[in-house]
């Protein structure tokens, strides 16, 4: 006798019936904050970039490369891992938005590189990021938590990444901006900071 197993029921998301109003609140905040790096006039920073010393340029490129690595992890591993642990389709939707914006953030650093930097210097920074033991260890630790089957620890790790791991890298462009350097680049970073503040808040709230 053949046993027929019915397929699991698939339900469409209904934003008119929500278990947690915070999901809609954060969704609306994220969508109203939407932006793309192409809208920021980074080319206005070319004179300021050229006035930086070679050491300052190298430091800036390396900082942004490190941030790109973290954004890549959050886009491809972190947010998807949290999405898998979501309790409702509304949580899944918010996490999918967060995942996409992390990809936008990573794209933003490439926009900075292509506008201000020489290709050889950027290539050297990417090679450095792959060879730098502390940076790679930081990435490995995040991935260990995201790949494990412990939902609460994933959220804790994600909040740490969305807060001090990112923000420690944001200090340099804010420092330059406070001195009238790379001000348009700093405007782009402020858009990223605005996003990360919401990401960290939401994930921490769900914890």
Language-model segments: what does each one mean?
Residues 1-207:
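Non-heme di-metal
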């Amino acid at each position: 006798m053949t046993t027929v197993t019915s397929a699991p029921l698939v339900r469409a998301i209904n934003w008119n019936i929500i278990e947690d109003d915070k999901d809609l609140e954060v969704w609306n905040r994220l969508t109203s904050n939407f932006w793309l790096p192409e809208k920021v006039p980074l080319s206005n920073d070319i004179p300021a970039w050229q006035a930086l010393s070679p050491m300052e340029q190298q430091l800036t490129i390396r900082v942004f490369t490190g941030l790109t690595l973290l954004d890549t992890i959050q886009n491809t591993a972190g947010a998807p891992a949290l999405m898998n642990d979501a309790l409702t389709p509304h949580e899944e939707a918010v996490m999918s938005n967060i995942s996409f914006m992390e990809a936008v953030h990573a794209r933003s650093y490439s926009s900075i590189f292509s506008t201000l930097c020489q290709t050889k210097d950027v290539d050297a920074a990417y090679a450095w990021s792959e060879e730098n033991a502390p940076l790679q260890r930081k990435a490995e630790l995040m991935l260990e938590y995201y790949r494990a089957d412990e939902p609460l620890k994933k959220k804790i790790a994600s909040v740490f990444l969305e807060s001090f791991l990112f923000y420690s890298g944001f200090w340099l462009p804010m420092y330059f901006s406070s001195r009238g350097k790379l001000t348009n680049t700093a405007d782009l970073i402020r858009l990223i900071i605005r996003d990360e503040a919401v990401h960290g808040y939401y994930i921490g709230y769900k914890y």
